Amino acid sequence: MSARAAAAKNTAMEETAIWEQHTVTLHRAPGFGFGIAISGGRDNPHFQSGETSIVISDVLKGGPAEGQLQENDRVAMVNGVSMDNVEHAFAVQQLRKSGKNAKITIRRKKKVQIPVSRPDPEPVSENEDSYDEEVHDPRSSRGGLVSRRSEKSWARDRSASRERSLSPRSDRRSVASSQPPKPTKVTLVKSRKNEEYGLRLASHIFVKEISQDSLAARDGNIQEGDVVLKINGTVTENMSLTDAKTLIERSKGKLKMVVQRDERATLLNVPDLSDSIHSANASERDDISEIQSLASDHSGRSHDRPPRHSRSRSPDQRSEPSDHSRHSPQQPSSGSLRSREEERISKPGAVSTPVKHADDHTHKTVEEVVVERNEKQAPSLPEPKPVYAQVGQPDVDLPVSPSDGVLPNSTHEDGILRPSMKLVKFRKGDSVGLRLAGGNDVGIFVAGVLEDSPAAKEGLEEGDQILRVNNVDFTNIIREEAVLFLLDLPKGEEVTILAQKKKDVYRRIVESDVGDSFYIRTHFEYEKESPYGLSFNKGEVFRVVDTLYNGKLGSWLAIRIGKNHKEVERGIIPNKNRAEQLASVQYTLPKTAGGDRADFWRFRGLRSSKRNLRKSREDLSAQPVQTKFPAYERVVLREAGFLRPVTIFGPIADVAREKLAREEPDIYQIAKSEPRDAGTDQRSSGIIRLHTIKQIIDQDKHALLDVTPNAVDRLNYAQWYPIVVFLNPDSKQGVKTMRMRLCPESRKSARKLYERSHKLRKNNHHLFTTTINLNSMNDGWYGALKEAIQQQQNQLVWVSEGKADGATSDDLDLHDDRLSYLSAPGSEYSMYSTDSRHTSDYEDTDTEGGAYTDQELDETLNDEVGTPPESAITRSSEPVREDSSGMHHENQTYPPYSPQAQPQPIHRIDSPGFKTASQQKAEASSPVPYLSPETNPASSTSAVNHNVTLTNVRLEGPTPAPSTSYSPQADSLRTPSTEAAHIMLRDQEPSLPSHVEPAKVYRKDPYPEEMMRQNHVLKQPAVGHPGQRPDKEPNLSYESQPPYVEKQANRDLEQPTYRYDSSSYTDQFSRNYDHRLRYEERIPTYEEQWSYYDDKQPYQPRPSLDNQHPRDLDSRQHPEESSERGSYPRFEEPAPLSYDSRPRYDQPPRTSTLRHEEQPTPGYDMHNRYRPEAQSYSSAGPKASEPKQYFDQYPRSYEQVPSQGFSSKAGHYEPLHGAAVVPPLIPASQHKPEVLPSNTKPLPPPPTLTEEEEDPAMKPQSVLTRVKMFENKRSASLENKKDENHTAGFKPPEVASKPPGAPIIGPKPTPQNQFSEHDKTLYRIPEPQKPQMKPPEDIVRSNHYDPEEDEEYYRKQLSYFDRRSFENKPSTHIPAGHLSEPAKPVHSQNQTNFSSYSSKGKSPEADAPDRSFGEKRYEPVQATPPPPPLPSQYAQPSQPGTSSSLALHTHAKGAHGEGNSISLDFQNSLVSKPDPPPSQNKPATFRPPNREDTVQSTFYPQKSFPDKAPVNGAEQTQKTVTPAYNRFTPKPYTSSARPFERKFESPKFNHNLLPSETAHKPDLSSKAPASPKTLAKAHSRAQPPEFDSGVETFSIHADKPKYQMNNLSTVPKAIPVSPSAVEEDEDEDGHTVVATARGVFNNNGGVLSSIETGVSIIIPQGAIPEGVEQEIYFKVCRDNSILPPLDKEKGETLLSPLVMCGPHGLKFLKPVELRLPHCASMTPDGWSFALKSSDSSSGDPKTWQNKCLPGDPNYLVGANCVSVLIDHF
């Protein structure tokens, strides 16, 4: 203070001395150090004044401080550490340890002229102020301002003004002293040292400057110079500037200030501190420090760079985008980035880049560069060292020539850099002799020089920054490029290197491990090759931080950028060259599978038929988009400076476009399409010219485009970055309902549109910027669509760093075909109103009006999904065919790439550890198989080929291949062409190929990538089969027979086998996929139900069953035939049954659930597809190769026989099951003689035994688990049936050893459904071997229907399920169990459908389960609950597939009838689960003999693993069962549900949800004899048995099921709540009801909440029909028994309470919001939430559906709670 006092001694009255504050960054120079000497300190006061300040006593000439610091400057801070009242040694130490750079804040006396002399206090206050400011300045400028700026652009202005105000702070002090009317000069001299001045100083905050056009300027109530007395009610007296800034920042958009006018403007008359305003101008070094805070981290940096930067900036626009991208990404990994940035700050080079902020665009060049680095590294880093920034800046300013950039920098930096620069010339010898460090973010440095090399002799040394080599600028080049450039120089060539000595910067770079930093977007799919690698799908963004990982070429170290641009995980990815190679292989390999030649012949053969042609086109369109992007696209995060075009995909995309353009013409305009030039394309489709889009954009409107995915990719390439919205359909029926309501005149096929949507999603989901789940019950999608478009428009976009080739040209005529126009299927619409039009949404080739030429297959085919052509074919066949084609194309052209990319995320998460990259790839291609089945009739070969390609990669077993070959013939779906099919099939046949296919299937089908991944991992094999490949695969595995059988059956029942198969497959796929997929779960259910219905009615379902059945058998048979196949088929078979209890095939042929029943194969296939994947995953865990095989065969098994699929699984691990399966076959044979033989083959006793023996393997797959579940369900009724069937059909299974085709046909029609049920039961039974004994029971049951038996059977299934869960818990079994559990529900579904279809012993039993399930299912369908079932599937896959994902499980307890259970679990581990499935198998074995005991025993283990294991199984099962069966099952089932009620009553049911499942099973067995009603309950519950607690709730529901059915039929009636609904759960031993809330609501809505638990249900007005008083309740439970199946392998953990909502079956006209508290604090980053909901009437865990939370508008994950929109209980 003495200094300040001294300052007051101004000689002239009008002249006053003030203390200016400056912040300077010094760079240590060799021989100079910082070039300053300091004196003073607490222990060394001034000899005269006694001042203890640290004072600059000397500044060396030519040193770093010259021109920046002056003698007598008071040092206020060094590197943010206050130097006030410190000892001299401390100050010296701070300078020494500051390394290469020191940020020094000094106070300098300055004389100013003031109208009135100022009193002494003012200077004092000034000083204090300045000190205050100093403290603030460093902090704020360093961290606060910068980080703020980066975080919010709006803060930029404020921060700038703040910064200015910072320096004014010193001025502020004058305010404090402004009280005296006139400035007065005061001099106080101490007579002795210890004398005090007696002053108490205060500071004021005042308005230093108001920026133009700001809020404050417009308001006019604040003027510059006003003293701020209060900020938002807080008094500012003695408040530091930093605190004031913080207060303002926390104002959250509303700032209240109390200010006092300074009429005399005393404060304003104080000259600006150079610090504040100058820094902003970057006119002074000091200012630089200030600017640094303003612009970003380093004012110095920004200052130095601005000039230079402006120069370089323009050339290198990348920096700016980079800045942006860095900005957001940096936030993600703020920790590492920050530390890195700080280090950088210490180093000039590193710091400079990080310093700049995108927000500081004002500093244009310099700042941009800095920002770029900053963002990359850590925008939060407040201030990199200015000098370093300069050093780094040249790096940033790549565009500018190095010398230019460098020289300006050096001049800016006191010319320190200039003298250190050197120009070295020498001739290259064998090598340049240099090792390089650094990268594009900090500059390229010499890390080592070879002794005696020419470079060493010329004076290059370690630590030199290379600015230029041979006129090539090295300032912004990545390290890998720099190394390659030097390596590529020819020997003997003269090398000219411009370098600069920056050893200190170099050291910092080495210490902080910084170098490269740039962002890339991937355009291919990759499976990590090492534990440290990162797998990725298309469209993912990474920040690359080291392009020469470990000093070797080939790998890059990268950080994955997740949601909200946060950095999620770091790992190794291939370098650019390898990526290009992998991408090219990915694009061509699939083609080889199909083969260009094969395609040519295939399409040529199709020319005669327009329909076929359309199919072929669809095939191609289903393929992933062929992109023009490189494997890695350099991107930056930027705002869209224009209204982005909007592309809408989905079944009602045409309606959405027209509605937007009609209702909001000022915002949206449809881009008109033009006919293509003659000869360009024979297709009738039109094109949209980029010029047309540009005209609309120029009008400030969104251009609505009706284009194909390929066109979207081209738009992205042209940097138009369209907003791509995918309207995700809930179900086929939902699509039909919506289109009837929205566009009744439309002639488009809802089925085709639905299937096309699935294919599109599978192949091109990476193109979607947002997805909206459609609810057929309302038109909420429209508001969500507009909101999504607005949100996307306002979001930052990852855009290409460079310009696209020709993208800038207006006409974009570079590639007339690609850039000058976009294919517009919509335009085709106008020309053709045929069904094919629906494809317009997705594909160019969608129209089939024009003559077909081979050319048509070009890119447009890839774009469009070739489903429309199939419309002509029967529904079942059409779907299959479509899927097949689309899928196939994907596989073929680009299966690995697109499908892989889509599925891979799922793969990636679980599959990396679990499977090989190839496997994953195979999985990725799996979706193609899916399509392939669809296309099967027309282009099955291509589909198969794709599968094959994938298969080749993954499957090991060639044996399956032969079978696969058969598949192409028998099942065109499987293989588009026989040749391709054979090749493909062979590869496919091995477990791995199958695996591959499933992945693809998943990708295409599942909407949520996460879920997809999970599916892949957990049940990739199964998925492949059930999903896409199932049709193909199963056929492939036992292809020749099963396909044939299926085809024959199809032909007999439906249409040509091709069509039927194809259709079936497609349906399956879409449905299955849907179910599995995140949201589609519900929708698929819905569709499946309808589908089944239709199938049943037409009797086609039977054929489907036949086909499927044979497949199933085949699959078993196949496993027997070949070890590879044998093991695989088991997996395969269980998977199909597992999920739906029926093979997926049936369902696909019949897109409707009914079909599923009748044709369990298609329906189950669909479901199973997902399940199988999960199962296969489990299996994979235990034995990678076998699981792969299983996958391959499994999918086939699925396709061949959904029921069988289960059987196969059963067979896999249960000989008994095999026998049991046979009995179902026998019933089938009854329907059809062929069925029996088919069954015999597929279900030979030996395979069953083998399966049983292989139980563990199966269990790992999770398919096994599912099978167990189904077994439990069926054990009572089904097992008896099975016994009968077994007896009759056991021999047929033996026959099954023969080619599956013939035998399959026989059993397929009816037996398949029965078989499905049986299979499920059998599978469960086989798990334990006791089931063998059980099969007789099943047989008996099949002969007669007994509700008790049904209940018992369901109970058994439950117990199996529980057991499985238990087994899963202990080991890898968990995944299997999970899957198995879902299978149970599926089985129930099959049963239900089957029952409906045929009145066999099984049928009754199936009916019982179906009732409970069906009811629930039905409701979900109506309410669009089917999607939740899908989530279940999805969740299940996700569990297996995702290493860590949060699963929020919503469990609607159908049986309970009380409501939904929702739980949140986190998935973490993937591979560990496979082992538990084997355990599960054993429990399953126990189960058949003594279900109750088994259940109990397993129950406890389940409890130990309840969350994970049960969750998985339950999820999948529930999804499948609930959606399809519930919907279909008629009221009779409801009565069945009542028996469930009894079941729930049973204590075991009550206590287990997951464990309870186990309990349930025992309950069933014990209660079945004791109380038929109870058994019935259990049976009904069997599908959802996984959650015992749910079951309890269901007991109440048992009564409710009827209501449910009624409810479905008549919404207006209130659904009664049975007293037991609320009470029973509590009574149950298995779970504890923590809280119960109930209330009566009417049309006005309301809130039902539980304060203790934080759970609440918000019922909006209009959710309940008018005139209805509806009682609603929910119970919050803590019960392992009813927990959703958590996938331990995925590391799922329950994060939220389990909530059971009721009454079950209640549907809302508007979605109600269920809020669940959760503890997933890490959710936003690496964790993934999965919502698991059970819609089963029984509340079975098996019916847990996975609902996708991320990105789903129906689910909102907050910091402490998850909000879920549900439309039914």
Curated annotation (Swiss-Prot):
Phosphotyrosine, modified sites: Y131, Y821, Y1139, Y1164, Y1353
InterPro entries on file: GK/Ca_channel_bsu, Guanylate_kin-like_dom, P-loop_NTPase, PDZ, PDZ_sf, SH3-like_dom_sf, SH3_domain, ZO
GO biological process: ameloblast differentiation; bicellular tight junction assembly; cell-cell adhesion; cell-cell junction organization; cellular response to calcium ion; establishment of endothelial intestinal barrier; positive regulation of blood-brain barrier permeability; protein localization to cell-cell junction
Residues with Phosphothreonine modification: T184, T266, T353, T808, T845, T847, T853, T860, T867
This protein's UniProt keywords: Calmodulin-binding, Cell junction, Cell membrane, Gap junction, Membrane, Phosphoprotein, Repeat, SH3 domain, Tight junction
UniProt feature, compositional bias: Basic residues: 102-112
Listed GO CC annotations: bicellular tight junction; cell surface; cell-cell junction; cytoplasmic vesicle; gap junction; plasma membrane; tight junction
Region annotation Occludin (OCLN)-binding region: where it falls in the sequence: 632-875
Stretches with biased composition (Basic and acidic residues): 148-174, 298-326, 878-891, 1108-1124, 1273-1286, 1335-1346, 1402-1419, 1539-1548
Membrane topology listed for this record: Peripheral membrane protein
Biased composition regions of type Acidic residues, renumbered to the chain: 123-135
Compositional bias ranges of the Low complexity kind: 892-905
Gene Ontology MF: a single term: calmodulin binding
Guanylate kinase-like domain residues: 609-790
Sequence ranges of Polar residues compositional bias: 933-952, 962-976, 1387-1401, 1460-1471, 1514-1523
Pro residues bias: start-end ranges: 1300-1310
All residue ranges annotated as the SH3 domain in the record: 515-583
All residue ranges annotated as the ZU5 domain in the record: 1635-1769
PTM note: Phosphorylated at tyrosine redidues in response to epidermal growth factor (EGF). This response is dependent on an intact actin microfilament system. Dephosphorylated by PTPRJ.
The keyword Repeat appears for this protein: yes
Annotated localization: Cell membrane; Cell junction, Tight junction; Cell junction; Cell junction, Gap junction
Domain PDZ: 23-110, 185-263, 420-501
Primary role: TJP1, TJP2, and TJP3 are closely related scaffolding proteins that link tight junction (TJ) transmembrane proteins such as claudins, junctional adhesion molecules, and occludin to the actin cytoskeleton. Forms a multistranded TJP1/ZO1 condensate which elongates to form a tight junction belt, the belt is anchored at the apical cell membrane via interaction with PATJ. The tight junction acts to limit movement of substances through the paracellular space and as a boundary between the compositionally distinct apical and basolateral plasma membrane domains of epithelial and endothelial cells.
Domain notes: The 244-aa domain between residues 633 and 876 is the primary occludin (OCLN)-binding site and is required for stable association with the tight junction. The C-terminal region (residues 1151-1372) is an actin-binding region (ABR) that interacts directly with F-actin and plays an important role in the localization of Tjp1 at junctions. The ABR is also required for the localization to puncta at the free edge of cells before initiation of cell-cell contact. The ABR is also necessary for Tjp1 recruitment to podosomes.
Family: Belongs to the MAGUK family.
Protein name from the UniProt record: Tight junction protein 1
Organism in which the protein naturally occurs: Canis lupus familiaris (Dog)
